[in-house]
Amino acid sequence: MTKLIIHLVSDSSVQTAKYTANSALAQFTSVKPKLYHWPMIRNLELLNEVLSKIEYKHGIVLYTIADQELRKTLTKFCYELKIPCISVIGKIIKEMSVFSGIEIEKEQNYNYKFDKTYFDTLNAIDYAIRHDDGQMLNELLEADIILIGPSRTSKTPTSVFLAYNGLKAANIPYVYNCPFPDFIEKDIDQLVVGLVINPNRLIEIREARLNLLQINENKSYTDFNIVQKECLEVRKICDQRNWPVIDVSTRSIEETAALIMRIYYNRKNKYNK
């Protein structure tokens, strides 16, 4: 494995640089990365501290810094060390300015912008928490997305991930031989997505969960036939109503959420035409 050091430097949380780095690293299976996070770098004193760390451990520098003087100092330093220094969104900002004819604002305001998007995200997170695991079914019509699936198919973390993207997601577990909420018999506008998983993989996850909780008596929870029937029944429910089904066996939460968002926005764009 080839070791690769990456310094993420930002005047905010470094999340943009981090996501970009991880997306790029996914293309290199033989690389063993070491990421150093340097958030909230907003003055020369803090930047100089980071520069000393970079000098000690050479590596690629990815940055998102708005202040022009700090950017110049960082790029000049890296140039002298002969190490790559890449602005994550600099090219995007420049192209936006050229295309729109609007000059880039020189002054950076570090006060967070509490706009509609911010409050929509907060509301979506609150909604996901209150409507987790089949709670408050009387408010399902407020949801953007409803997830259904057997227990431990990543419904909760997927709901939260969707919430961080401003989408209200409720999730409802399907349990074998238990009545499902009557909302499935109604013609609803919300996007309903079924989550299923390979039964053997689901049993592994459930067994690990039971061991963590030190529970040894719930045999039906890990019974192959029951687990298989739960997944098949969810598929059947969704197929009968033309609801999409996603197999999460080999997907990360981010991938599952991205697929759901693609379905949601394709559907929304279609209805808005």
Swiss-Prot record:
Pfam families of this UniProt entry?
Answer: Kinase-PPPase
The superkingdom of the source organism is Bacteria
Alphabetized InterPro entries for the sequence: Kinase-pyrophosphorylase, PPDK_reg
Q: Known EC number(s)?
A: 2.7.11.32, 2.7.4.27
Q: Sorted alphabetically, which keywords does the UniProt record give?
A: Kinase, Nucleotide-binding, Serine/threonine-protein kinase, Transferase
User: Into which EC class is this enzyme placed?
Assistant: transferase
- Which reactions fall under this protein's catalytic activity? N(tele)-phospho-L-histidyl/L-threonyl-[pyruvate, phosphate dikinase] + ADP = N(tele)-phospho-L-histidyl/O-phospho-L-threonyl-[pyruvate, phosphate dikinase] + AMP + H(+); N(tele)-phospho-L-histidyl/O-phospho-L-threonyl-[pyruvate, phosphate dikinase] + phosphate + H(+) = N(tele)-phospho-L-histidyl/L-threonyl-[pyruvate, phosphate dikinase] + diphosphate
Tell me one GO molecular function of this protein.
Answer: protein serine/threonine kinase activity
Positions contributing to ADP binding: G149, P150, S151, R152, T153, S154, K155, T156
Family, per the entry?
A: Belongs to the pyruvate, phosphate/water dikinase regulatory protein family. PDRP subfamily.
Q: What does this protein do?
A: Bifunctional serine/threonine kinase and phosphorylase involved in the regulation of the pyruvate, phosphate dikinase (PPDK) by catalyzing its phosphorylation/dephosphorylation.
Q: What is this protein called?
A: Putative pyruvate, phosphate dikinase regulatory protein
The source organism is: Rickettsia africae (strain ESF-5)
